[in-house]
Design a protein with these regions (language model features):
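Non-catalytic terminal regions of proteins
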Residues: 1-54
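Compositionally biased regions
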Residues: 3-4, 60, 144
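Short acidic DE-rich linear segments
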Residues: 134-145
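Short, surface-exposed coil-to-beta transition loops
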Residues: 79-80, 107
Length: 145
């Protein structure tokens, strides 16, 4: 893997049936994450929370709109294979269910599987260039999906 930092790009998705967003960030580093997001509780994200990771999934607040949701960050999306996308999608699903106080167990596995698949599909859209990154020069309140 090259040590050169890749330009950060931000993608936003709206799951429609859940009152939260999914943000996928590719490239960049802590400074980019901090510029766009706060913790879910509105605090600053600590550098130790996002440093030296191959990927990250956390509950966040989007600074620009104060919207709540899930951030999945891939410093280099080219390295994201099916197992890694599945891994982060599972974390994202569990984070979102936790945010909304929804139960996760064998009795509601269909909703868990559906949401994890949706997360993975969004990441795949980013990886394959099927969606455009947000342009943050203007206020953005619409999703790319």
């Amino acid at each position: 893997m090259s040590s050169k930092k890749r330009q950060a790009k931000l993608y936003q998705f709206d799951p429609m049936i859940y009152p939260r967003f999914l943000w996928v960030v590719t490239g960049g580093d802590y400074i980019d994450i901090k510029k766009w997001f706060l913790t879910y509780d509105g605090e600053e994200i600590e550098e130790s929370d996002v440093s030296n990771l191959g990927g990250l999934t956390i509950s966040v607040t989007f600074r620009q709109t104060q919207s709540l949701g899930i951030l999945i960050w891939f410093p280099d999306i080219r390295l994201a294979k099916a197992n890694w996308i599945t891994h982060e999608s599972t974390h994202g699903t569990l984070e979102l269910f936790e945010q909304l106080g929804l139960r996760v167990d064998y009795r509601n596995q269909e909703s868990v599987a559906y949401l994890a698949g949706w997360f993975a599909e969004c990441i795949e859209f980013v990886k394959t260039g099927k969606v455009n990154a947000l342009k943050l020069e203007k206020k953005t309140d619409e999703s790319n999906n």
